[in-house]
Amino acid sequence: KLAGDRRASGVVILHRGKILAEQYWKPDEGARAGNKEREYGALVRGRDAAGQVIEDVASVQKSIAAILVGMARHQGLLGLDDPVTKHLGPGWTKASPEQEQAITVLHLLTMTGGLKDDLTFEAAPGTRWRYNSAAYARTLQVVAAAAKKTPNALTREWLTGRIGMGDSSWVERAGAGGEAGLNALGFATTARDLARFGLLILADG
């Protein structure tokens, strides 16, 4: 009940790797109740075999992207101290070439790249923290470029296909691309698939 009151769409509780409790709320419940904050129907991207929603999980995808960066690093495809320009080329920000060159993969992961939301320069990398989804979204692009694979191909090969997250994939977000295609992809998944991901993290990968 608490999760539903906090506008959750679903919750799965695991104990020793097994489902202890599971509950879902319909996408239109908030709309019927007149609660605009509970409306998340626009995030629904389908349903799994059990009829539960597959939805864009918004900023939860940052954890997925971070794990993929770690996997790419483990394979020697990139380093955390690599300039982002090494993988994306110049011009991925609106900063000067010198300012842009100083931003590393680690800066993106720690949100200390020194960029504003529109990717203009704000501060020297590493000197200021700013929650920046637009900049963080570039981490997935970095991994894809380093691996020479599409986001869905590498995610399926490295992660979702290996641990049984069969209802998870990257999906295009209509109208979310913006001028530079920022946040153009969202990670669509289910509560059960995220539970599998949680078990992976709990087991130290």
Language model features: what each stretch is:
Residues 6-9, 55-64, 100-103, 129-137, ...:
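Aromatic- and histidine-enriched alpha-helix N-cap/loop-to-helix transition segments
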Residues 135-142, 185-205:
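Active-site-proximal alpha-helical segments within enzyme catalytic domains
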Residues 1, 75, 111, 200-204:
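Generic structural signal for alpha-helix termini and adjacent loop/cap motifs
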Residues 14-16, 23-25, 60, 111-113, ...:
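Active-site-proximal beta-strand/loop segments in catalytic clefts of secreted hydrolases
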Residues 3-47:
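A short, well-structured edge-of-sheet supersecondary motif
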